[in-house]
């Protein structure tokens, strides 16, 4: 990604129609880069997998909702594990179209919408709500967590993964990793050429504590916070020095991914 600038702290990031419209347009442009990527059983680049962490447990006969369902491959994974109902929400019409094809032979319910929006999904209905590398796109984290809380049955689980909030500040040059910018300043970061395309996007920038505190405010009980180790699937793999944003070289020194599991009381 080609970083343009990080804006100054703007306080609580509220729902922005302009940001959502721009991100939606750009995601429709770059969706083909993500077909089958950032999907279960994976949690993120080089991160431990569901097979290693076992956060979902048994999902047979459970109703599941995928926030930021992308190409539908995480829902496909849930179907293969016996989930009874598959629901998904994604901002991108192109992603939803791909997900329809991925899930063509199983019953599913897909909606093209921002995750921040109230779109009439059933309340106190789902056993599990999850989001794999998507939750950080929300322009209103508090509203999104409150909606997710409302979708879950009492005792239901909410599991999400996202870039470790400090990882974006770790740059690599000639094998040396250094801190770039201020982790303290929340706000938004703009990228002009997402995935090398003419696809400008705006991504909120938040601290790890912000995610945790907003979960608490939404009445979730936090069960687990994971700063993921490198998956055992990369055991023995060589780590060539790389200046790429995601690299095994960096991942073995700092977690690319945070994973949080919380419960509705």
Predicted regions and their residues:
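Class I SAM-dependent methyltransferase SAM/SAH-binding core
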Residues: 65-118
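Short catalytic micro-motifs in class I SAM-dependent methyltransferases
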Residues: 133-136
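A short glycine-rich, Lys/Arg-flanked "PGG" loop and its adjoining helix->strand segment in the class I
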Residues: 142-157
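Acceptor-substrate binding/catalytic loop of class I
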Residues: 162, 166-168, 196-210
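Short alpha-helix
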Residues: 201-225
């Amino acid at each position: 990604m080609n970083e343009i600038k990080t804006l100054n702290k703007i306080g609580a990031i509220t729902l922005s129609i302009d940001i959502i419209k721009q991100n939606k347009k750009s995601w429709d442009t770059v969706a083909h880069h993500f077909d089958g990527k950032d999907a279960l059983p994976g949690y993120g680049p080089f991160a431990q997998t569901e097979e290693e962490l076992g956060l979902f447990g048994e999902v047979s006969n459970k109703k599941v909702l995928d926030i930021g369902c992308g190409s539908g491959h995480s829902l496909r994974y849930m179907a293969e594990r016996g989930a009874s109902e598959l629901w998904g929400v994604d901002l991108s019409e192109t992603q939803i179209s791909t997900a329809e094809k991925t899930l063509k032979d199983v019953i599913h319910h897909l909606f093209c919408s921002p995750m921040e929006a109230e779109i009439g999904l059933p309340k106190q209905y789902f056993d599990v709500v999850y989001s794999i590398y998507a939750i950080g796109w929300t322009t209103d984290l508090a509203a999104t967590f409150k909606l997710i809380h409302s979708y879950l049955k009492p005792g239901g689980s909410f599991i999400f993964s996202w870039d470790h909030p400090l990882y974006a500040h770790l740059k690599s040059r000639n094998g040396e990793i250094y801190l770039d910018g201020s982790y303290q300043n929340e706000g938004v970061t703009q990228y002009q050429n997402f995935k090398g395309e003419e696809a400008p996007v705006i991504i909120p920038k938040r601290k790890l504590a912000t995610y945790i505190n907003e979960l608490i405010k939404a009445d979730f009980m936090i069960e687990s916070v994971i700063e993921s180790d490198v998956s055992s699937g990369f055991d023995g793999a060589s780590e060539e020095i790389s200046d790429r944003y995601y690299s095994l070289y960096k991942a073995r020194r700092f977690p690319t991914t945070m994973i949080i599991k919380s419960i509705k009381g």
